[in-house]
Amino acid sequence: MRRKDREVSDLRQQLEIVRRCDSCCIAINDPDQDAPYIVELSFGLEHLEDKDILYVHSAKEGRKLELLAQDPHVSFFMSCGHELVYDAERQMCTMNYESVSGYGIMRLLSAQEALHGLDVLMDHYYPHERRPYHKKAADSTAVYGLEILSMTAKKREKK
């Protein structure tokens, strides 16, 4: 990381940034395009003793699922806390932010695991109350677990 003064190296602080974000972009290898296929997804984070998992959901068909079946290695990025900062005296501006990026392996979850993944995802958006969802909706949803293998974070704060 070029700007070491903005690096967030503490895992707990990195996970707090993840919890403040409301969407996650996933880059999937697309060999037909010689470029990544990028999608923005809702997510939930589970911090376990030996690993961290991002849970995401999707329709049960489509380009994303086809590509993940070919190569489950993905990169991810999320950011939050965006605030334009304008310095009138210097007539310059910058942006405050927090961001996390990394890579890992996506795995399609079994039906039982998928229900847990959906619970974690719902807890991310509704942390103080359980929001039930119809079993039919859960049955028609593909749920993936992204095991994070590497993650970095940075932020620019108000001075």
Residue locations for each model-derived region?
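Short beta-strand segments
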Residues: 21-60, 76
